Amino acid sequence: QFLDAEGGGLLEFCRLPFFSLSLFSTPPMSDITYSWNEYIRLNEELVYKVAKSGWQFDCLICLSRGGMRPGDFFSRIYGKPLAVLATSSYREAKGTVQSNLDIAECMTGLAELKGKVLLVDDMVDSGKTIQEVVAHLKKRYPAITEIRVAVLWWKAHSVLKPDWHCVYFEDSPWIHQPFECYDDLGAEAFSEAIESGKTLGRLQ
């Protein structure tokens, strides 16, 4: 049980013996790959940091697709509905180069946005995406009083500093997340892999 009787606390969760995630710090490199176990641990650490800060939020928003998994951790542990806002900027060079940002007009999961908002994503890279999303939300939903940002990874060249993060990179490695094994695989190739006995998303 993570929630107290009123559903407003994270009593047992905050007592868990979390250790520093500095073990995930790495020397400068162009690519870094995370296993499922490391990825899950990062998500738990992020929720823990927000919980221990004592800051309470009224609404929870994640950015699609990168923020959906971290957002799900927050939604389940806090017992709050998760709103999903679709954004897209990585399009060129097979998804590794940022182009113009598109922000969806509609958001799923919440009928009304107001009060304090926690915005969750997987990383702050250039920082421009979250910066534009924050401006968009404040303009479109004037009842919002405060927006704070929580991410797994924060890169030094970002124009925005998140309120909470797990790993800080002084350089700008390309981060490979464990579920990328499914990217652009296609239903036919996926089916063939499963039929041949392969487990693409195995725990590592």
Where are the model-predicted features located?
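PRPP-associated nucleotide enzymes
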Residues: 1, 9-204
